[in-house]
């Protein structure tokens, strides 16, 4: 039906070999790439044409994770607004993507949403069962990411999400944190543990 048509000025032809789940050189499907840039219309078109919305990258990232903010966008790649990304997250979730799946790094969709600074996505994920204290392989929780564990490299810190996550039940004692994010009492305890 939509194949060979026009979607906002883009030609929408079926792949020549009919494989709607073909992996690109980075190990990602067209559906996952559409989720990554929050293109809900393309995501829906691909599903309508038979794409499998449950396929992950070879690193284990799901389309829901990509839409939420897991992974690094290429220079010039537009991840969409937080509102558009929320719609992509909702569609991936409605199509069966699990909010608590983690990739090979232990990152979940919630880690990505916090890194992205998207409180709307954070709330949606938590409302649908995401683990607020999930720890990735580096020992980082969503709260530690909001506090700025990436800050030295990305200058990415979200104080408003720190408050939001704690209000929604995040445990401040879970996950690794930067020394400068610790209270004076916590710094003293850490120093005593090292001695």
Name these PLM-found stretches.
Residues 7-20, 77-79, 188, 193-195:
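Intrinsically disordered, low-complexity segments enriched in small/polar residues
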Residues 1-6, 44-52, 87-98, 123-131, ...:
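Ankyrin repeat domain, specifically the short helix-to-loop turn at the C-terminus of the second helix
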Residues 32, 41-44, 65, 87-90, ...:
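Solvent-exposed, polar/charged alpha-helical surfaces in well-ordered, non-transmembrane soluble domains
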Residues 21-25, 33-39, 66-85, 112-119, ...:
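Ankyrin repeat A-helix N-terminal signature
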């Amino acid at each position: 039906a939509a194949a060979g048509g026009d979607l906002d000025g883009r030609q929408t032809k079926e792949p020549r070999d009919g494989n709607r789940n073909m992996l690109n050189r980075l190990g990602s499907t067209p559906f996952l790439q559409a989720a990554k840039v929050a293109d809900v219309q393309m995501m829906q078109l691909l599903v309508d044409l038979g794409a499998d919305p449950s396929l992950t990258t070879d690193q284990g990232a799901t389309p829901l994770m990509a839409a939420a903010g897991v992974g690094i966008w290429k220079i010039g790649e537009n991840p969409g607004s937080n509102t558009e990304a929320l719609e992509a997250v909702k569609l991936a979730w409605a199509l069966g993507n699990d909010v608590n799946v983690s990739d090979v790094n232990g990152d979940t969709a919630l880690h990505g949403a916090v890194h992205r600074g998207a409180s709307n996505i954070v709330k949606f994920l938590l409302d649908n069962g995401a683990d607020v204290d999930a720890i990735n392989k580096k020992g980082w929780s969503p709260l530690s990411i909001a506090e700025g564990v990436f800050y030295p490299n990305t200058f990415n810190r979200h104080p408003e999400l720190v408050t939001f996550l704690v209000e929604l039940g995040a445990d401040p004692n879970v996950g690794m944190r930067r020394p400068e994010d610790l209270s004076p009492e916590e710094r003293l305890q850490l120093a005593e543990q090292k001695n």
